[in-house]
């Protein structure tokens, strides 16, 4: 790959350009990118840019906290290799919870289109009746353990930001999170540690209308093109 993953183009438009268009449609302009591989290429987007110099040996959570000083007040955190519809973003913005996590209730058809085995690459997600998340990001043994799929999009209130900073700083002291090396931790590890601490992590359920590019095959998938066209149409209307 000769560019950061978020700059990969599908139908002539990069993932990050598509994501920025959706954010701008909801008047969200204060955007911070956190780059690793070939991060200097991200300067052209004109947003604030933070760089994880250790990107090759660290994971998502470490990368997020390379921008720790930017985590203040209400914050939306999004992976760079996804695109979501304006409607999904609107649902997230409506949530009044301190920690709100978008989950796809219709995940199974998307996973089946992308892989022979829908348990491949899927993670556990267990909900309380009121939509509060009890478990996230573990390896599922059965489909029953997956009540939705995390898409990599979430929102934190000022209080929620303080909660995750506390979890991260505590983890820095031991260099571990959930028994794993902190630098290799995933975002879902942070969310699970937050749940374990007794803080509420609330789901924002959606159905479809988002895409993720994990593999080259995702770019060739007809469903990817169909969803991106639909997302673009709703932006243009």
Model-predicted segments: where are they?
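A structural signal for short hydrophobic beta-strand segments in well-ordered beta-sheet cores
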Residues: 7, 125-127, 203
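Conserved N-terminal catalytic core of the sugar/cofactor nucleotidyltransferase
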Residues: 9, 13-77, 181
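A short acidic, often aromatic-flanked loop/helix-cap motif at beta-alpha or helix-coil junctions
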Residues: 55-59, 108-109, 210-212
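The conserved acidic donor/metal-binding loop of glycosyltransferases
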Residues: 80-82
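Conserved alpha/beta core of the MobA/IspD/sugar-nucleotide pyrophosphorylase nucleotidyltransferase superfamily
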Residues: 136-139, 143-237
């Amino acid at each position: 790959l000769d560019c950061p993953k978020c700059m990969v183009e599908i139908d002539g438009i990069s993932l990050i350009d598509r994501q920025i268009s959706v954010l701008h449609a909801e008047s969200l302009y204060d955007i911070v990118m956190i780059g690793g591989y070939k991060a200097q290429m991200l300067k052209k987007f004109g947003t604030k840019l933070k760089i994880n110099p250790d990107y090759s040996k660290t994971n998502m959570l470490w990368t997020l906290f390379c921008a720790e000083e930017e985590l203040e007040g209400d914050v939306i955190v999004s992976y760079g290799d996804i695109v979501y519809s304006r409607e999904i973003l609107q649902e997230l913005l409506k949530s009044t919870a301190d920690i709100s996590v978008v989950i796809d209730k219709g995940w199974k058809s998307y996973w089946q289109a992308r892989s022979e085995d829908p348990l491949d690459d899927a993670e556990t997600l267990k909900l309380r009746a009121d939509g509060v998340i009890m478990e996230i990001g573990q390896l599922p043994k059965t489909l029953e353990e997956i009540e939705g799929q995390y898409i990599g999009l979430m929102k934190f209130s000022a209080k929620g930001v303080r909660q995750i900073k506390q979890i991260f700083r505590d983890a820095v002291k031991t260099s571990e999170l959930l028994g794993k090396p902190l630098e290799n931790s995933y975002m879902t590890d942070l969310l699970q540690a937050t749940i374990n601490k007794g803080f509420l992590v609330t789901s924002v359920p959606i159905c479809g209308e988002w895409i993720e590019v994990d593999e080259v095959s995702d770019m060739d998938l007809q469903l990817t093109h169909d969803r991106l066209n639909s997302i673009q149409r709703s932006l243009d209307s």
